A protein has these predicted regions:
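Generic, well-ordered alpha-helical scaffold segments in large soluble proteins
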Residues: 40, 61, 65-68, 90, ...
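Short, well-ordered beta-strand elements within core beta-sheets of diverse protein domains
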Residues: 40-50, 119, 166, 235-243, ...
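Short linear loop/turn motifs
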Residues: 57-60, 225-230, 386-390, 425-428
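A helix-coil-helix interface module used to build multimeric assemblies
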Residues: 1-201, 206-213, 274-275, 286, ...
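Glycine-rich cofactor/substrate-binding loops
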Residues: 1-36, 97-98, 279-458
Length: 458
């Protein structure tokens, strides 16, 4: 079935049909297309644009099509131009002329905008649910390891001691912001475009608010031209998905490092690891590596959407058909990554002794040494210089700050006393960092509980 016969004298060539068709990827929106059509038919009947009998006949027919697709009794014709054409054609086959009345005061331009919004509204909720599940795992693990000392890094160099729970909660905060972005994205997406028609609205006395309420939209679009031209909602959702993937990719990178024998901070469960075809000893963090790799795929989907839309004059152009494959792929990829990543993290075994051992090296407590001097009256820049000299002396002697003799300390600055050794112990370094947002164990426990409670309410 073609919806646009009449103007044309020739049949569409197979090449053109295959190239033009979107049903291989938009068929996933069959449910949304039918939901939108049921609401549209209901509105047409209530407004007297078609008879109540015709409206009821259409609705019954559409519900039958939906039931048959979902039961497998009806197969979607992959030779159809798109899912809208297939469903309208099937409806007309089943109920006759009333099926031809469905498209009154509607264009495929506003129909497809509606379908994509209906579909993506559900997907925003699905992604949010998966992100929240990951946040809960992070919060629980952070509470469990709120006293596990590890090195914090800058430039991938050991910098200052923290606790593992604090490190985990950094990702918890990132993901909480991602949830907020998803909510914002949904708020802007929640406008119903149906009634915009091709671009200039309609002469029929429709009531768009009826359709919006039936479909659960917060409001209707204000401008018919914008209603069919807009794909901001796809771009924004893809952008949020890209940011989520940035966070997952960074987390994956760290897990990959931590799993290596050079770190050995953690070990992934066998169920979330793979081996080598030639090296019997290997246990590879493939899930984390794939998440890291798939981030580029989602970024590419976002760039596809931006590039498709950047040069299109208003209103609809066929270029916009390319929006669906990109946004669908981005959604599918992120959902798959979250589905695999969360249980991988949940079952990951932490090795506290290796974290503690790593934190004991690299003069990670040097800042605390300088802070001790500052608290005892030495200007910070002088304290910084003195501590740097102590580190250099430790390197010469092959020792560390904890074991450097007090005489060496006093040779650099006579303010030093025995008390400095207590101040630079790793546990003391961490426990003293009690400023809000810091890694002191009691703060980390409280923050883990806060994040868990927030996640429970999302």
């Amino acid at each position: 079935m073609q919806l646009w016969k009449g103007r044309f004298k020739k049949e569409l060539s197979k090449t053109t049909n295959d190239f033009n068709s979107s049903i291989p990827f938009d068929s996933r929106m069959y449910r949304e297309d039918i939901e939108g059509s049921i609401a549209h038919a209901t509105m047409l009947g209530k407004c007297g644009i078609i008879s109540e009998e015709s409206s009821a006949d259409i609705i019954e027919g559409l519900r039958g099509i939906l039931a048959d697709i979902e039961s497998g009794a009806l197969k979607i014709d992959m030779e159809a131009e798109d899912i809208h054409t297939f469903i309208e054609g099937e409806l007309t086959k089943r109920i006759g002329d009333n099926g031809k009345r469905l498209h009154t005061s509607r264009s495929r331009n506003d129909q497809v905008a509606l379908d994509v919004k209906l579909y993506l509204k559900k997907e925003v909720a699905a992604v949010k649910k998966l992100v929240v599940a990951l946040i809960k795992v992070i919060a629980d693990k952070a509470a469990q390891y709120s006293e596990t000392v590890m090195p914090g890094y800058t430039h991938l160099q050991r910098a200052q001691p923290i606790v593992f729970g604090h490190h985990l909660l950094a990702y918890g905060e990132m993901l909480l912001r991602d949830v907020s972005r998803l909510d914002d994205c949904l708020r802007r997406m929640d406008e119903m475009p149906l009634g915009s028609c091709a671009l200039a609205g309609t002469t029929y006395p429709i009531d768009r608010t009826i359709t919006a309420e039936l479909l659960g939209f917060d409001r209707i679009t204000n401008n018919s031209l914008d209603g069919v031209s807009d794909r901001d909602f796809c771009i924004e959702f893809a952008s949020v998905l890209s940011i989520i993937m940035v966070h997952l990719s960074r987390f994956s990178e760290e897990i990959i490092m931590w799993c290596s024998w050079d770190f050995k901070f953690v070990e992934l469960d066998d169920a979330f690891s793979t081996g080598s075809s030639i090296m019997p000893q290997k246990k590879n963090p493939d899930i984390a590596e794939l998440v890291r790799g798939k981030s580029g795929r989602v970024f590419g989907d976002t760039m596809t959407l931006l590039t498709v839309m950047k040069g299109i004059a208003l209103a609809y152009n066929k270029d916009m058909q390319e929006d669906k494959e990109a946004i669908f792929d981005a959604v599918d990829t992120v959902k798959m990554c979250l589905t695999a990543f969360t249980p991988m993290l949940d079952t990951m075994r932490v090795i506290p002794e290796n974290m503690r051992k790593a934190a004991a090296g690299g003069f990670i407590n040097a800042t605390d040494c300088a802070d001790w001097l500052t608290k005892n009256g030495v200007p910070f820049r002088d304290a910084y210089k003195a501590t740097g000299e102590l580190v250099a002396r430790c390197i010469e002697l092959g020792t560390d700050l904890e074991n450097l003799p007090l005489a060496e300390y006093k040779a650099v600055c006579d303010v030093f006393t025995e008390d400095v050794y207590n101040a630079i112990s790793l546990e003391k370094c961490v426990s003293q960092r009690t400023a809000f947002g810091g890694p002191a164990p009691q703060l980390v426990k409280a923050q883990a509980q806060r994040v868990r409670e927030i996640a429970e309410k999302l």
